[in-house]
Design a protein with these regions (language model features):
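RNA pseudouridine synthases
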Residues: 1-182, 289-293
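Conserved hydrophobic positions within beta-strands
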Residues: 81, 172, 209-212, 245
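The conserved catalytic core of RNA pseudouridine synthases
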Residues: 125-156, 165, 169, 185-241, ...
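Active-site-adjacent capping/gating segments
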Residues: 258-266
Length: 299
């Protein structure tokens, strides 16, 4: 169990759960309240209530619980494997499939399916074996998966060094006037809603390039290329320029087309093989759910 101490230095009294929400960016307010209620967060060595108001010089002690280990079951679920060798796989993930197990999704995930198919790297533990980078449940498309630790380490370094090119198809609201564009706006967790990301001055540098593929009366199909890989980056950036993704339940408008989640597809991945150095490029077609939506827009 990991322990962390924070000294409250402000003369102004503040609720402990609200204060820690800003201090612990990796935890939601609900997570923090649960830790307080269960006695994992104490003030001056004493348990407190979630509405306790901190005083200047209070010492807050946080004992982080070890993450729950889930027994990940191997499941015979069909997977679209675009490429495979001894070190990695390229998978075309369908829309609606969760990438790895969690408390709310213990089975039926991509990891459950892949473990039935082959061995995966162990660097990310039993919950996320082989997962080098993630895409959201309702985002479809290409994903790199590592089959051994050596490949996993190298692939992670390559992504951090911007040596992996990733492009996406996105169907957005509104008609984008310019054929090309770059969105350079920092992204961080939304202080008002911890489950969401937002463009914030103090955020991490985030850059998305886009070009228009097709225009409709009230919508635009674009290709996006990530220069950085922040959580929800394309979704947040497109909302920032007032062209949110069609169907996006978090960042989109209340009135949107029913596409069962954001219209976003990982269309291509390009990189050099982490072990052999061979240049690799993989590309998929626009998925049927996006094609069906665009056919309706043409009518």
């Amino acid at each position: 169990m990991e322990t962390k101490e924070i000294i409250y230095a402000s003369p102004k009294r503040e609720r402990i759960d609200k204060f820690l929400q800003n201090e612990l960016s990796d935890l939601s307010r609900t997570n923090i309240q649960n830790l307080i209620s269960e006695g994992y967060i104490k003030v001056d060595g004493n348990t407190v209530k979630t509405n306790y108001k901190l005083k200047e010089s209070n010492v807050i002690t946080i004992d982080y619980k070890e993450p729950e280990e889930l027994d990940v079951v191997k499941q015979d679920i069909p997977v679209d494997i675009v490429y495979e060798d001894n070190d990695l796989l390229i998978v075309n993930k369908p829309k609606g499939m969760v990438v790895h197990p969690s408390a709310g999704h213990k089975d039926g995930t991509l990891v459950n399916a892949l473990l039935y198919h082959c061995e995966l790297s162990s660097i990310n533990g039993t919950i996320r074996p082989g997962i080098v980078h993630r895409i959201d449940k309702d985002t479809s498309g290409l994903l790199i998966v590592a089959k051994n630790d050596k490949a996993h380490v190298k692939l992670s370094e390559m992504i951090a060094n911007k040596e992996v090119k990733r492009k996406y198809y996105a169907l957005v609201h509104g008609s984008i006037k310019h054929d090309y564009g770059t969105i350079d706006a920092p992204i961080a967790r939304n202080p008002k809603e911890r489950k969401e990301m937002a463009v914030i001055d103090e955020g991490k540098p985030s850059i998305t390039h886009f070009k228009v593929i097709d225009r409709f009366e009230k919508y635009t199909l674009i290709e996006c290329e990530l220069e950085t890989g922040r959580t929800h980056q394309i979704r947040v950036h497109m909302k920032y320029i007032n062209h949110p993704l069609v169907g996006d339940p978090v960042y989109g408008p209340r009135k949107t087309l029913n596409t069962n989640g954001q219209s976003l597809h990982s269309k291509s991945i390009e990189f050099n093989h982490p072990i052999t150095g061979e240049h690799l490029y993989f590309e998929t077609e626009i998925p049927s759910y996006m094609v069906d939506t665009m056919v309706k827009l043409d009518k």
